[in-house]
Amino acid sequence: MLPLVALVGRPNVGKSTLFNALTLTRDALVHDQPGVTRDRHYGVCRIDGQPLFAVVDTGGMVGKEDGLAGATARQARLAVAEADVVLFVVNVREGASALDDDILAWLRKLSQPTLLVINKIDGVSDTTVHSEFAHYGFSDVVPVSAAHRQGLDDLIEQVLAWLPERSIGEAFNEDSERIHIAFVGRPNVGKSTLVNRLLGEERMIVSDVPGTTRDSITVDLERDELRYRLVDTAGLRRKSKVEEAVEKFSAFKTLQAIEQCQVAVLLLDAGEGVTDQDATVLAAILDAGKALVVAMNKWDGLATYQREQAEDLLSRKLGFVNWAEVVRLSAKHGSGLRELFRAIHRAHVSALRQFSTSEVNKALEIAYQTAPPPSIRGHVSKLRYVHPAGSNPPTFIVHGTRLKVLPDTYKRYLENFFRKRFKLVGTPVRFLFREGDNPYEGRKNVLSERQIQRRRRLMRHVKRK
């Protein structure tokens, strides 16, 4: 399971800015006005695409208006109860306040490890930073400037040292032979019905009321001599619709299931098409870099013209993930299930494929010769060599020069070329671009004695002229 880190503190200390900096997103609303964040929401801290831990941002706890027993404080308490490590965020420019003292007193009653994060240190002397909160008696203090990303590496290092020794990979090590599949989508599209149909029993509660499934439920299945682990998740809804505390936790469990799976099945309602909520779920899958199968449920209930409309809408809304296979099925009646498992298997094989350095360099050479990078303001990027850097998703590191000006269109060309050449289906393909250092930079050419004598003769000849 992905470890969880909670950000707690009074309003306007920079928790949301720190959340955005750790997750490399702008998911948390940032404003100088205190109290902008009311609810808690989740993200994932990654390095080079690899997830390290989940982060939960909470609303600022206001003393007079809410009190520690108010609605915002309840959200903070729930976040802390879920968390493995708590980051107590304070503002060095405003110094310690009575509300900071109250929050600290509450945190000290809990069992979770707590780090003191002193934010907004830019422009503040080191003496002030270390003395302002010294009376709190923390042994682990990390000064940062979230807005300028100062001190974040030290913070991440401290957090990792405090987290329990577990990782996403442990979920697979329990049964590495099983294909881990997460069924995700917005509420009431038929995820539980589909899992029940696959299992041949009423394992999941099924209802017409959206949100019946509140937690991620894991079951094992063997089919066609292959072993699977199925995860039925709670539906991800728009943030404005997620109100109950238990439902917020369900959303986090769904994000965890996406992080831990090997193949994500995005279930859509064929009659309603692709909605904004579906796009939100898809974004979480793509952000995690997981293999993807799109399943159009309730296909049997559509007339011919409705199916044509659904196909047209799908191609327009999801054209940017045309590498994912689309399966038309009916969870209620069981049609299309064999095609679903075939698509899952193809996506899984593609996502975990291993590549040799020689074959990917041959592919890069052919791609480069077929369509060289365009000239940008008189500069042309040069791609020297590539090597595989991992799987699930397949990742390649390209080395060269002037790669910062390499257009996004050419990067997509490389992705499509590699996908077609290696017959990769149902999985993202990632490229990382590294500009090589000049190996001769800073080195002085050492002349031999013969070269020195020759240079002297030339210089005397020049002077006589």
Swiss-Prot record:
Chain positions recorded as GTP 2 binding sites: 185-192, 232-236, 297-300
The encoding gene: der
Keywords: GTP-binding, Nucleotide-binding, Repeat, Ribosome biogenesis
SUPFAM superfamilies registered for this protein in UniProt: P-loop containing nucleoside triphosphate hydrolases
Record-linked HAMAP family: GTPase_Der
Described function: GTPase that plays an essential role in the late steps of ribosome biogenesis.
Binding-site residues for GTP 1, renumbered to this chain: 9-16, 57-61, 119-122
GO BP, one annotated term: ribosome biogenesis
Subunit structure: Associates with the 50S ribosomal subunit.
Name of this protein: GTPase Der
Gene3D superfamilies, sorted: 3.30.300.20, P-loop containing nucleotide triphosphate hydrolases
Domain EngA-type G: 3-167, 179-352
Glycosyltransferase recorded as keyword: no
Organism for this UniProt entry: Xylella fastidiosa (strain Temecula1 / ATCC 700964)
Keyword Repeat in annotation: yes
Molecular-function annotations in GO: ATP hydrolysis activity; GTP binding; ribosome binding
Domain KH-like: 353-437
Record-linked InterPro entries: AAA+_ATPase (IPR003593), G_ENGA (IPR031166), GTP-bd (IPR006073), GTPase_Der (IPR016484), KH_dom-like (IPR032859), KH_dom-like_a/b (IPR015946), P-loop_NTPase (IPR027417), Small_GTP-bd (IPR005225)
Similarity comment: Belongs to the TRAFAC class TrmE-Era-EngA-EngB-Septin-like GTPase superfamily. EngA (Der) GTPase family.
